[in-house]
């Protein structure tokens, strides 16, 4: 796992994701609209429950070049699935980017980016990697194809399917 430090300050309200955010085709970023992402974290390092308690965090410590490329693309208002790695291997919550990615001030190289996110809500039930792999709709999903990647895009269809699975 490549992520490091999480959890810093608190933010007042934590809006929830509404259904109308997943009804558009997967061109949101190209048209300046909402994009969808999945961020991975080891729950023993920084669980979604800790994130909720903190109210906000900066997503730091991402070293992989492709994950950094994705992180640099995150914009204010984008939605993020929070994924627990390790023994859990499941999407457990939803967060929202409160600003666009920016250079990580703690990175001595001056090349790595970070983004500030706030929790929106915990999923009704976690959606496991095994469930995702078992569903052919997710064949092209980076979580299935490039499993070690810690920051990845999520298509609108994948987002909607995971949301649906979390409610069943």
What residue spans do the PLM features occupy?
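Short beta-strand-centered aromatic/proline hotspots
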Residues: 90-100
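Short, charged beta-turn/beta-strand-edge "cap" motif at the junction between a beta-strand
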Residues: 83-89
